[in-house]
Amino acid sequence: MMFAFELQDRLAASNKKSVKVLVCHPGSAKTSLIETSGNLTTKIIFRSLCLTPMVQTAERGSWPSVMCATETNLDQRALYGPTGRMEWIGPIGKGKLEPYAYDKDVMSKLWLFSEQKTGLTWQI
């Protein structure tokens, strides 16, 4: 999210107001992601979790993305996703962020580090 917040700042500084940057996450959702990319231990743990109420359906996991793509008045300095237990499940809304998530110095350093490591320079 810090990378997205830095992108927001850079777009605002260059007066690009037609672009909106939002951050969302699905929470804990029953998808094939773990089955296709997780190691054996992760797969076993996730399969066990899927037997509990701590994992929601893939459809519910998509709701934060749909909300961010369709709602017009969302705060750009936020994280949207499930707001229930451990922010893994529950109603969709604005999540809780720690104060360091808004650390401008770290955001800028992350942006520059990303440019250095990828060899790409964003012309914003």
Locate each region found by the language model:
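NAD(P)H-dependent oxidoreductase Rossmann-fold/reductase module
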Residues: 1-124
